[in-house]
UniProtKB/Swiss-Prot annotation:
Keyword hit for Translocase: no
GO biological process terms held by the UniProt record: negative stranded viral RNA replication; RNA-templated viral transcription; symbiont-mediated suppression of host cytoplasmic pattern recognition receptor signaling pathway via inhibition of IKBKE activity
Region named Binding site for the cap structure m7GTP: 53-238
Top-level lineage group: Viruses
Cellular compartments annotated: Virion; Host cytoplasm
Residues that coordinate or bind Zn(2+): E391, C498, H501, C522
Residue sites binding Mn(2+) per the record: D381, E383, D526
Protein name: Nucleoprotein
Higher taxonomy: Viruses, Riboviria, Orthornavirae, Negarnaviricota, Polyploviricotina
Length: 562
């Protein structure tokens, strides 16, 4: 997706709105830490680190000095991240959401590793290049035969660490507002109040646009304290002791009250999963993405990395130099369900059989599926979301065979909304649907079987959630009007095949579209009518049910009053 432009500021605004409930007023905390640093930090050592970071090449001694200074900073601050690895499982996040998160973290991992690649042998760490350095370096590498013409590498400024353990560099970069403010005050010879005023104005500007070097120069005429900020383009891996524009903007964001700034988000173990879920929803709405091309992170990538690095604290502004690992190391995604508890022994020996379906029911399902022809056109449709389906149908028009079943929903509120605007199924009619039938059907489907569907996304998710990535889906992609050409005829001819769609369905009209039908959506009827569109006619003969009705529902529990 490297060719896609990123509307960075719009993304930031959307993230601010969507995550505003987790933003916190941090000005007082930041200034308390700033005062602690002004009192306890040895700024001669800070100056030494700053000089070291301006050199083109650094060694193990330089890294030791950097890490020692960051440890001192961490010990003086109260706003610091603590190591807290997070484990995400199916439950509060759906399997689909976990798969999306896992994919994004893997892409982010590839981007970061390509941006901070190891070159020239073990222990030589390189940051990124400016365009000028890139051009000159490419010419030299081509001259000596190391790089082929046309091989493009881009990034920030050349930074080489000639060290034995590159892993020690992890989490030693990035700015902290308390450090930025204290350095501006102490090293710039300014009062703390003047620095706060100048950075507050910079933060206010940030609520309307991304401040650039021109904006910085203009604000410096009003606030002389801002003149100590480096007049250079942002770099990827620079010390938090460097007074860069991005560091100043971050500090300013913390000083703006009521701005719901992303920089002020606070994460706790109890809120982590909800924040991640909300982030994925915002991502989908704004069509955000992870771009694996080396370079600066876009707003979504930046927030995702910071959230997943440490599960507690302020991911943007806290001291995190003592955190070990990267985002993809510290947020673990587990797709497997929790192991079943061992069976409880029964009195006369042995243990109860803990299965969802009785063996005879599962065997009947297996025989029904074996009656399908693997090579015939096979339609499939579901009602309800893929993570909570309430109806599923499989239909083969050549033989007129079909499998049709129901499932009681977990989310009753969402089910009632879907009933009103879509399928018209009443909860009381499927309350005693035998659990586990849909899963058993999917489990026993022949390997690599091909299905036809009108809209494949939900079916794909349903199959993937059951570990059936081998099943194939052909999406016919009819328009809404095309798909329902035979709707009235199908219901008139075959409504006796399904009596579970008794509810009233309300027309739902989206802006710019024709109002939907008020006929209920039945998975079986939909399969028959969609097939009819392709064949040009609806069959006269009655389709044949493969799954007996008596196994679709269980007997309701009875209460005996003594």
């Amino acid at each position: 997706m490297s060719d896609q432009s990123v509307p960075s500021f719009r993304w930031v605004q959307s993230l601010k709105r969507g995550l505003s409930v987790w933003t916190t007023p941090v000005k007082a905390d930041v200034l308390n830490d700033t005062r602690a640093l002004l009192s306890g930090l040895d700024f001669s050592k800070v100056a030494s680190v700053q000089r070291m970071m301006r050199r083109e090449r650094r060694d193990d001694n330089d890294l030791t000095n950097l890490r020692d200074n960051l440890k001192e900073v961490d010990s003086l601050m109260t706003m610091r991240s603590s190591q807290k690895n997070m484990f995400l499982k199916v439950g509060s996040l759906s399997k689909d959401e976990l798969m999306e998160l896992s994919s994004d973290l893997n892409k982010l991992k590839e981007k970061v590793q390509r941006s901070e690649r190891i070159i020239g042998g073990s222990g030589v760490y390189q940051g990124n290049f400016t365009t000028t350095h890139l051009t000159r370096r490419s010419e030299i590498l081509q001259l000596v035969g190391i790089q082929r013409p046309g091989l493009n590498r881009r990034g920030g400024v050349v930074k080489i660490w000639d060290i034995k353990e590159p892993a020690l560099l992890i989490n030693q970069f990035g700015s902290t507002p308390a450090v930025t403010i204290s350095c501006m005050a102490e090293q710039g010879g300014e009062t703390l109040n003047d620095v706060v005023q100048g950075l507050t104005d910079l933060g206010l500007l940030y609520t309307a646009k991304f401040p650039n070097l021109g904006d910085l120069e203009a604000l410096s005429n009003k606030h002389s304290c801002l003149k100590v900020i480096t007049q250079e383009e942002s770099q990827i891996n620079i010390s938090g002791f460097n007074l860069s524009l991005s560091a100043a903007v971050k500090a300013g964001a913390c000083l703006v009250d009521g701005g719901n700034m992303l920089e002020t988000i606070k994460v706790e173990e109890s809120t982590f999963t909800t924040i991640i879920k909300t982030l994925l929803e915002i991502k989908s709405k704004e069509r955000m993405f992870v771009d694996i091309t080396p370079g600066q992170r876009n707003p979504y990538e930046n927030l995702l990395y910071k959230l997943c690095l440490s599960g507690e604290g302020w991911p943007y502004i806290a001291s995190r130099s003592q955190i070990k690992g990267r985002a993809w190391d510290n947020t673990v995604i587990e797709f497997d369900v929790s192991p079943r508890k061992p069976p409880v022994p029964i009195r006369n020996g042995g243990s109860p059989v803990l299965t969802t379906l009785k063996p005879e029911v599962e065997e009947q399902i297996k025989r029904s599926i074996e009656s399908l022809s693997v090579h015939d056109t096979t339609w499939i449709d579901i009602e309800g979301p893929p993570f909570d389906p309430v109806e599923m149908a499989i239909y083969q028009p050549d033989s007129l065979k079909y499998i049709h079943c129901y499932r009681k929903p977990n989310d009753v509120k969402s089910f009632k909304d879907q009933s009103k605007y879509c399928h018209g199924i009443l909860l009381k009619d499927i309350e005693f649907a035998r659990p586990g039938i849909i899963s058993a059907i999917i489990k026993h489907l022949p390997k690599s079987m091909v299905f036809t569907a009108q809209g494949s996304e939900d079916i794909r998710r349903l199959f993937d959630m059951h570990g059936r990535q081998d099943l194939k889906i052909v999406d016919v992609k009819f328009t809404a009007e095309q798909s329902r050409v035979f709707e009235e005829l199908t219901w008139k001819r075959f409504e006796h095949l399904c009596d579970k769609h008794k509810g009233i369905v309300i027309k739902s009209k989206k802006k710019g579209t024709t109002p939907a039908s008020t006929n209920a959506h039945c998975a079986l009827m939909d399969c028959i009518m969609f097939s009819g569109v392709l064949l040009g006619a609806i069959p006269n003969d009655k389709p044949r049910r493969l799954l007996p009705l008596d196994i679709l529902f269980r007997e309701p529990d009875t209460t005996v009053v003594l």
